Every structure is written in C-alpha cells, then in structure tokens.
C-alpha cells in the first residue's frame, strides 16, 4: 500500500504536469499569428487579399472584446454573489443547536472559505478557457485556408489543441486547488479524529464551483441564444441572407455567444461536476473506519483517479494530432471516436493497479457493504464505459452521418411542422439508452459499495475529463471559426448530462450520510410530496430559461431590423455602406442575459433551502430524487432534439436532400429552398433547448444536491430534522417500502 507522501506526490505531480501540458498546447496554437496586412506566417496563403486579412483581424478583435466585456459584467455579479451567499453559508452552517453549543463558527467559516475558493477557481478556469477559445478561433480559420489535406490537418490540430488547453488547465487546476484546500483544512480538522467535519467543510468547494456554473450556463446560454436566434430570424428567415453574413449586425454577438455559453459555461459546468463528485466521495468515505484508518492514501483515491486521467489524456492526445490525423472532413468523427475509446481503455487498465496501490485489502462502507480494491475498480469502470456509451449514443442521435437526423431532414419536405414533430420524437427516443446505462451504473455501484460505489461511478464518468472537455470545446471553436470565415468572405452536449445525473445521486448519498439517515421512506407523505415538487422544478426552470431566450431574441430581431431600415445600403450590401452597429447587439445580449439569469438561479438555490428549513430533511430527500429523475430525462431529450434540428439544417445546407419535380427529376434542396427554411425554423426552436435549457438542467440537478449536502446539519438542527413546521419524519405503516441509503 502507498505511503502518504507517495499519494501526495502523485496528485501534485499530475496537477503540475497538466498545467504544463496545457501551456505546451497553447504554445503550439500561438505559433499561428493573426496580424493585419498579412504580416504573420499565418496569412501567407496565396488567395488571401490584404483587405481580407484586415477584416479577419477586425472580426477576431471584436469577438475578443465582446467576450471579455460580457464575462467581466457577469463575473462582477458572481463575485457579489460569492460575498453575500458566503456570509449566509457562514451563519447557517455554523448553527448546530446543541445543548452545549449553539454555533460552531469554525465549521461555518471553513465551509464558506471552501465555497469562495471553489467559486473563484471556477471563474478563473472559465475566463482562461474562454479567452483561449477566442484566441484560437481566428487561428483555426487561418489554418483551414491552406489547400487540401494540410488545411484539414492544421485546422483540426489547432482547434483540438485549444480545447486541450481548456481540458487540461481546468482539470489540473481543480485537482491542485482541492488538494491544497484539504491539506490546509487538516490543520483544523485532523483526518484521524475529525474526518467527517473535514470533508463536510470541503464540500463547500463543490458548491462554489457549481454556483458559478449556474450563472455561466444560464447567463451564457441566454446570451448566446438571444444573439443566435435573433440573428437567424432577422437574417435567414426575414431578410433571406446567409448565416454569419457580415451585413447582419447580430453576427458578432452570435460568435461571442459561442465562446460565452459553449466554452466558459460548459467549462464551469464540468468543473463543478468534478469538484462535486470528488467531495461527495470524500464525505461518503468517512462511513468506512477502514478507509480512515488506512490514512491519506486510501482517502485520496478519488483524487488519484482524476490525476491518473490527466496522464492518460495527455498520452492519448498525440493519437489525434500525430497518429490518426484528420486529412478530410470524413476523418473528424473517426479520430474523435478513437480518442475517446483509447483514453477510456487505457484509463480502465490503470485503475486496477491504482486501486490495489491505495485502498485497504478489505473495507466496509456504512457497516453493510464489504468492499475490496477490485470491487472499487468495478464501480469506476462502469462509470468510464457508461460515459463512453452515452457519448456514442448521443452522437448517433445528433449527427447527420446517421439515420435519425437524416430522417428529420427529410421531414422538412412537408414543412416546419413535420420537422418539429420528428425532432421531438427523436429527442424523447434518445433518452432510452442513456437512462438505461445510467441505471446500470447506479445499480452496479450501489450493490457493490453503496453510495461510495455510486460516487466512484460518477468519478469514472469524469475519469478522462481532460479529453472529453477538449473534444467538447473543439466543437464551439470550429463553429466560431466557420462564422469568422463566412464573415471575412473566405471560402465557405450527452456526456455532461450523464455525469451530472451520477454526480447528483452521489451528492444525494453525501446528504443522507451527513444527516445520518439509514433509510428514506418513499411513502412517507412528506417525502412523497417532496418527490412530486422536485419532479416539477425542471419544467418550471425550463419555462423560465426558454422564455428568457424568447424575450431577448425579440429585442435582437427588432434591433437588427431597425439597422437594416436606417443604415443606407446595409441590407443590399452596396459598396461603401455604413458599418452595422455590432456594439448595440452585444449590449442587448449582455443586458438580457444578466437580467434574465437571476430568477432561474434563485429558483434552484432557494428551493432546497426553503424546503429543508420549513419541511425537514425527508422533504428535501424527496425533492432531490424528484428533480433528478425528471431532470435527467428532460435534459437529454431537450439537448438531443436541439442537436438533431441543428444538424438536420446543416445536412440540408450541404445539398444532401432532394425532391422530385413534376418530371420525376431529383432537385437538390440547398440554402434558400423551402426545405431549408423549414430546417432553419426547427434549428431556431432547438437552439435554446440544446444550448440553454438542456445544459442548464445539469446545474439544477447538481446544485440542489450540493446545497442540501452543505446545509444538511442546519436542516437537521431544526426540530431534529422536521423543519419549522415540525412535520413527522415517518407517518406511514411499517410495511411500506423503503429506499436504503447505506
């Protein structure tokens, strides 16, 4: 078994290595220069005119400025939130209501400190990731200008390396900061005697990360879709001009939104997932006297899983950039699949020796589940491969390389209504396999090691986070690069939801561990009522976010139409026409997102606090289970429906859909056709589903659970967990079925 120093060295070395590797990838991207008048090596392509180089630089600068301005405004509000909510955490988590002590200010202060550190770390990771993405967008465009296979190789490598900067930087930063926080808190709460208090305080770190992710996902999602939907409606549908046309005043805001929502928001989301899964595992591990007795090597097992994933992801990165290279469009999906499969396989092989290296030969969780290192490996492995399967299934239902999306595209032949009907059906159907996979992971983890096994399965889902995040960020960078190319007149989300579901369940395990409940009676009236209320919350949340996008999009359409009407020659594209006012559109998106993200945020944050305060811990248990079971289904169906509509539109734009004319000849239906307009309507409806409401439901599931975990002792201290209304914890016959939590 490893010594404490060996475990420390492995975690720290992985974190430092990950940051250095992220720096190396950024250095590779920075070799491509984007300058005016083609001064840089990047603009030496023979067909690039000087005015095009200038235009490229201007667009890149405008996107960079807009992204920085939005994030500054959003993070100013987030910083104020950290201060205010941190004070609330300090007071409420200090309240213990014991005969000999009313407040434990040490516990409250440490929890609030962990919360602030988690929030600030998430903000730093999101900001750096977004700025790297903005930095890389134009460079990806430039790389794609090269002819033939060279253009594909260099553009793919540029975007993939930029995604890697985000993936390795975020994962390593989360790991290092959490480890430093644990060792700092140990001075107040020694592991051997105060392990429970130590990791309950550390749980604030996950709460901080997830709180910022809420504002990043909701605010960023509203920003990007207000601009995107507004640009599409005013441009392609109303005025019949192409997507990302430089005449459209909303295009810069649209491209800023790709970075704000799809990069910064997603990065904060997955940062929160990693922090929460790790914190939940640490809290639940205190139920095993053998793990605590074995010391830091066994306790740090969840951190070492993440550390191992950093090394594995780094090794597999070179497969995509140097071994299976992208030489044509058809190679992209294959290379990304190889990347996912190879990293998952290598990670699976390495978890076995890691488990035997760190964990005791036998240990018991909650006095019930007898575990061994190989059983712990099974839990991690089912999460690893579950994430892989969910990713592939999501691709099947959202890529136009496969039948489901092509079927949706063909449905556009009879109009937008059938397109929407087919898309909704696809989204609902796409939830079947992911939910089955998640259920299997939960069953294997729970039956093997109780809630500790479920938490390990969640960590398995996130085991190769650096690789998964690199691939996720690759998409928005390429999307943005394509938008820049079209504006410069050059030639023309499943994993996160699956991990969020398992993380939420792991946090639920941490919550019931903290409130020291051995069973939750699902037929207890208060628990059953809480379950129904929890199942309703994702729908309420979706209604809020969808309407917010609609309100902001209407403002954007009116502004774009005003500019087309008042700026001479803009719509017609006449020589010497006045420039569109991009700043006005950026301001509309910024103001709308900051204004509209507050009500959904309050709904998520206050729901468990109010429920626990007034109705007690069993009502909270029902609330969390209800929100999880309905939220994960809704998130998958919304995200995949929107993704299918998006790719059905792209399939039509590629000229892959044809209809017969009166003479029986096939006529290609590309851009500008009636079929294309129907596809655009579906894509526009799906935009807020796949980029705002669907992804933000991840945060709803996780944030409600981590809030309940952090405030668990406070809820328990109010009338013994019965709440201010003093509701009995169990008022049903003894024969009623119960859900074991240990």
Regions found by a protein language model. Give the residues of each.
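Hydrophobic packing and interface segments
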Residues: 1-742
């Amino acid at each position: 078994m490893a010594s404490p120093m060996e475990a420390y060295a492995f975690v720290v070395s992985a974190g430092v290595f990950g940051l250095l590797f992220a720096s190396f990838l950024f250095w590779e991207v920075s070799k491509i220069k984007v300058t005016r008048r083609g001064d840089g090596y990047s603009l030496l392509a023979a067909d690039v005119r000087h005015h095009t180089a200038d235009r490229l630089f201007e667009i890149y600068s405008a996107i960079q400025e807009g992204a920085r301005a939005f994030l500054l405004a959003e993070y100013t509000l987030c910083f104020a939130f950290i201060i205010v909510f941190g004070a609330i955490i300090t007071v409420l988590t200090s309240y213990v209501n014991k005969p000999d002590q009313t407040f434990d200010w040490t516990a409250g202060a440490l929890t609030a400190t962990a919360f602030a550190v988690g929030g600030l770390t998430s903000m730093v990771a999101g900001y750096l990731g977004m700025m790297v993405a903005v930095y890389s967008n134009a460079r990806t465009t430039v790389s794609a200008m090269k002819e033939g296979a060279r253009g594909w190789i260099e553009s793919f490598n540029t975007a993939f390396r930029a995604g890697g900067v985000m993936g390795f930087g975020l994962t390593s930063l989360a790991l290092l900061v959490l480890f430093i926080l644990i060792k700092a808190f140990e001075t107040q709460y020694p592991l051997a005697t105060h392990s429970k208090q130590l990791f309950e305080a550390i749980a604030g770190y996950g709460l901080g990360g997830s709180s910022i992710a809420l504002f990043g996902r909701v605010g960023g999602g509203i920003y990007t879709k207000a601009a995107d939907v507004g640009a599409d409606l005013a441009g392609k549908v109303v005025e019949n001009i192409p997507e990302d046309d430089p005449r459209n005043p909303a295009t810069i805001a649209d491209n800023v939104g790709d970075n704000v929502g799809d990069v910064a928001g997603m990065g904060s989301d997955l940062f929160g997932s990693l922090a929460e899964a790790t914190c939940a595992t640490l809290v639940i591990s205190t139920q095993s006297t053998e793990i605590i007795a074995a010391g830091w090597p066994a306790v740090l097992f969840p951190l070492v899983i993440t550390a191992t994933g950093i090394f594995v992801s780094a090794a597999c990165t070179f497969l995509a950039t140097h071994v299976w290279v992208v030489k044509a469009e058809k190679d992209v999906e294959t290379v990304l699949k190889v990347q996912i499969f190879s990293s998952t396989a290598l990670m699976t092989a390495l978890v076995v020796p890691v488990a035997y290296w760190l964990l005791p030969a036998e240990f018991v969780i909650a006095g019930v589940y007898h575990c061994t290192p190989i059983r712990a490996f099974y839990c991690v492995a089912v999460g690893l491969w579950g994430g892989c399967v969910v990713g592939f299934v999501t691709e099947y239902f959202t890529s136009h390389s496969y039948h489901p999306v092509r079927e949706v595209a063909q449905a556009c032949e009879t109009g937008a209504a059938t397109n929407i009907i087919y898309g909704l059906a696809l989204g609902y159907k796409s939830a079947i396999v992911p939910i089955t996979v998640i259920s299997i992971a939960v069953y294997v983890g729970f039956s093997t090691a109780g809630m500790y096994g479920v938490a390990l399965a969640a960590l398995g889902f996130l085991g190769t986070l650096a690789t998964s995040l690199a691939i996720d960020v690759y998409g928005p960078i390429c999307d943005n690069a394509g938008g820049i190319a079209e504006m410069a007149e050059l030639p023309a989300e499943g994993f996160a939801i699956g991990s969020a579901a398992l993380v939420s369940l792991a946090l639920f395990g941490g919550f019931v561990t903290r409130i020291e409940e051995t069973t939750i009676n699902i037929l207890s009236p208060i628990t059953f009522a809480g379950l129904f209320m929890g199942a309703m919350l994702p729908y309420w949340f979706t209604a809020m976010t969808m309407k917010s996008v609609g309100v902001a999009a209407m403002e954007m359409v009116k502004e774009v139409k005003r500019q087309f009407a008042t700026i001479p020659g803009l719509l017609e594209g006449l020589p010497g026409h006045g420039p569109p006012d991009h700043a006005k559109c950026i301001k509309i998106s910024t103001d709308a997102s900051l204004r509209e993200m507050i009500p959904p945020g309050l709904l998520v944050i206050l729901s468990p606090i109010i429920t626990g305060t007034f109705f007690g811990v069993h009502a909270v248990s029902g609330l969390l289970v209800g929100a999880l079971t309905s939220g994960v289904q809704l998130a998958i169906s919304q995200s995949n429906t929107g993704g299918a509509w998006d790719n059905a539109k792209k399939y039509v734009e590629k000229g892959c859909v044809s209809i017969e004319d009166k003479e029986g000849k096939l006529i290609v239906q590309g851009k500008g056709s009636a079929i294309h307009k129907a596809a655009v309507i579906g894509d526009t409806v799906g935009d807020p589903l796949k980029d705002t409401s669907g992804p933000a439901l991840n945060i709803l599931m996780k944030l409600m659970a981590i809030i309940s975990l952090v405030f668990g002792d406070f809820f328990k201290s109010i009338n013994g967990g019965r709440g201010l209304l003093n509701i009995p914890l169990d008022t049903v016959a003894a024969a009623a079925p119960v859900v074991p939590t240990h």
